[in-house]
Amino acid sequence: MSSNYDISEAAPFSYAEYRNILQSLSEQFDIIDYGDIDEKTESFCVIRHDIEFSVERALEMAKLESEMNVKTSYFFQINNNTYNPFSSKNLAIIHDIAKLGHKIGIHFTPSSSKEKIVRSEFFMMKRIFENLTKISVDRFSFHRPNLNSEVLSKNINIDGIINVYSNLFFEYFDDKIPENPEIKYISDSNHQWKYGHPLDSMNSSWRKIHILIHPFSWSSSGGNNYENYLNLLKEKNDTLMESINEEISNFPISDIIKHYNSG
């Protein structure tokens, strides 16, 4: 899809660009919570964040949004291989995000598209998450649902729980997505705007927008996918070395850092 917005003032996938996006959206829509939407809602913009690799970058985005008086939802995995939501550091970060007024949810891959199994697995993860974080959870998002589209087509509803892919916030299409669906879904997955850029809303008839943002894709400097992953890997390595240094008193952190930087 072609775009009509001007990105010359901010690097792609930089926090500056995200500020521009939020500013423009705020001028056109009420950016509200999933819980504020019902069948009678005529226009809305909801924004969510699925946390894949970086809890730290999620906090940076949460702070940015809070500065602009925008509240969104952050969905965490409890069995992610790249971060532990229950480490003391990450627990503090998740609490900081919640204290900023954002909602917290569960991000998971159900083992089946059967509603009974989805329900059971969600409530299991909800119990674990709430017991360890002391944060109440009332929502979930599916991880990589494109690999099992049936879980989207079923429009799974659980009383008292928000499924961000329910038909109140999301339209499922078996075939080609129409140019102007009733609910416009926008995602930055794989560092691409395959369904259009949020600023395309400036020249559209969209009245309902659901935006998925992955915080790990965004940074102060921005850049392409390759540059982003290089910077992300460096951040992860730095965090690992800091953690080892905290745990092992005789860890030669200065020598390791010199070797790492010279490589």
Regions found by a protein language model. Give the residues of each.
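Terminal accessory/targeting
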Residues: 1-73, 77-89, 98-100, 111, ...
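Beta-strand-loop-alpha-helix segment that lines the small-molecule cofactor/substrate pocket
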Residues: 103, 107
